[in-house]
C-alpha cells in the first residue's frame, strides 16, 4: 500500500482500528450470521453477546468500510463482503486467518519502543516466542485448522503446478512438507499412474489424512510423519516436491538426493528473495515480522538455492515463474 497524501498518512496510522473491527467480525462469524438473516444492531448485540452501544458503533464502522449494508430488515453483508469473503474460503479458514493476524499483532505493539532491541522484540515485551511448527506440534486442533486453511488457499497454486510439471516417468512422488497434500491430490487427479507420500509433522499428517479421505484418489496418497530435518526419509522416489516449505539447506538437499531414484527430479516452489537482504514483494510483510524475532533474518535467494543444490550433487534443469511470482526450480539427480 503506497501513501500519496497527508490523509493517507492519517488513515494508515489509525488502520489498526479498522483491521481489528474486520478481524473481530470474521472471528465472531458476523458475515455468516447476517447472510442467514439480516439483523438490526440490537439483534446482532444479542446474538453475539456484545454491549449494545459498542455493537452499534462497531456495525457503523463496518458499514463505513463497505462490508455490511443497512436495509429495512437490518444489516446484511455487502456485495464486497459476499464476493471477497463469503464466496471465497470457508468460515473456519477465514476465522483461522483472522486469529493468526490477531496473534501476530502484539509483536508490533509499542514498536517504536522496541525496534532498537538487539534480540527478539517479543522477549523485550515480556512475551513468549514460539515457532509456527512448534505450536502445531503441541496443538492438533491448531494443526488441523491450519492444514484445512492452506488446503483451501493453495487450490490455485496446485492447479498451476499441475499444468506446469512434466510428470513423464514419475510414478512415486514425495511431497515434502506437503501439509494437506493439496498439490499431490491435484496431480493424482490428473495422473492415474501416480502415487504420493506426504511427509510432514504428525498432527498435520492426521489432518491431511482426513482431507484426503474426501477424495477419490485417497487410496493413492499416504502420509508419513517425520521431522524431515532430523529424521531419515523414505526413498526410491521419482520426484520430490518441496512447495512453499520455506526451509532449505545443503544438508537437507543431500537427504533428498539420497531419497531419489537415479534420474529423479527435485522441484522447489517458493517466493525467493530477489537479492541478499531484499525481501520478495510477496513476502515483505512476513519478512519484516521474522526480523522482529531474529534481527539478522534474511530470505534466501534463488541463486543460493541453486548453489546448495549443486553442492549436494544435483544437476540444475530449469527455472520458471508462476503467476503471483513464485519460482519453480527443478534439478535432477
Map each language-model feature to its residues.
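Alpha-helical subdomain
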Residues: 1-63, 172, 180-185, 189-333
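Conserved Class I S-adenosyl-L-methionine-dependent methyltransferase catalytic core
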Residues: 8, 12-16, 22-24, 32-33, ...
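Conserved beta-strand/loop positions that form the S-adenosyl-L-methionine
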Residues: 176
Amino acid at each position: 500500500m503506497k501513501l500519496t497524501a497527508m490523509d493517507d498518512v492519517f488513515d494508515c496510522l489509525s488502520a489498526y482500528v479498522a483491521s481489528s473491527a474486520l478481524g473481530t467480525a470474521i472471528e465472531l462469524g458476523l458475515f455468516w450470521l447476517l447472510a442467514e438473516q439480516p439483523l438490526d444492531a440490537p439483534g446482532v448485540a444479542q446474538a453475539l453477546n456484545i454491549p449494545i452501544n459498542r455493537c452499534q458503533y462497531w456495525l457503523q464502522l463496518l458499514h463505513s468500510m463497505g462490508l455490511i449494508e443497512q436495509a429495512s430488515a437490518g444489516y446484511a453483508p455487502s456485495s464486497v463482503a459476499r464476493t471477497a469473503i463469503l464466496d471465497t474460503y470457508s468460515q473456519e479458514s477465514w476465522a483461522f486467518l483472522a486469529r493468526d493476524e490477531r496473534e501476530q499483532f502484539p509483536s508490533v505493539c509499542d514498536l517504536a519502543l522496541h525496534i532498537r532491541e538487539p534480540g527478539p522484540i517479543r522477549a523485550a515485551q515480556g512475551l513468549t516466542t514460539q515457532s509456527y511448527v512448534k505450536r502445531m506440534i503441541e496443538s492438533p486442533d491448531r494443526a488441523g485448522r491450519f492444514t484445512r486453511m492452506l488446503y483451501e488457499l493453495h487450490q490455485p497454486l496446485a492447479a498451476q503446478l499441475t499444468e506446469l510439471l512434466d510428470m513423464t516417468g514419475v510414478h512415486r512422488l514425495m511431497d515434502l512438507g506437503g501439509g494437506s497434500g493439496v498439490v499431490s491430490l491435484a496431480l493424482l487427479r490428473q495422473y492415474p499412474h501416480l502415487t504420493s507420500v506426504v511427509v510432514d509433522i504428525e498432527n498435520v499428517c492426521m489432518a491431511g489424512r482426513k482431507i484426503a479421505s474426501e477424495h477419490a484418489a485417497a487410496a493413492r496418497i499416504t502420509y508419513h510423519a517425520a521431522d524431515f530435518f532430523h529424521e531419515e526419509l523414505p526413498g526410491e522416489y521419482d520426484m520430490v516436491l518441496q512447495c512453499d516449505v520455506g526451509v532449505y539447506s545443503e544438508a537437507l538437499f543431500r537427504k533428498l538426493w539420497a531419497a531419489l531414484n537415479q534420474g529423479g527430479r527435485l522441484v522447489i516452489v517458493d517466493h525467493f528473495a530477489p537479492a541478499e537482504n531484499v525481501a520478495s514483494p510477496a513476502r515483505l510483510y512476513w519478512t519484516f515480522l521474522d526480523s522482529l524475532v531474529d534481527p539478522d533474518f534474511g530470505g534466501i535467494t534463488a541463486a543460493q538455492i541453486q548453489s546448495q543444490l549443486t553442492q549436494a550433487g544435483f544437476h540444475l534443469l530449469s527455472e520458471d515463474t508462476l503467476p503471483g511470482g513464485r519460482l519453480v526450480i527443478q534439478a535432477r539427480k
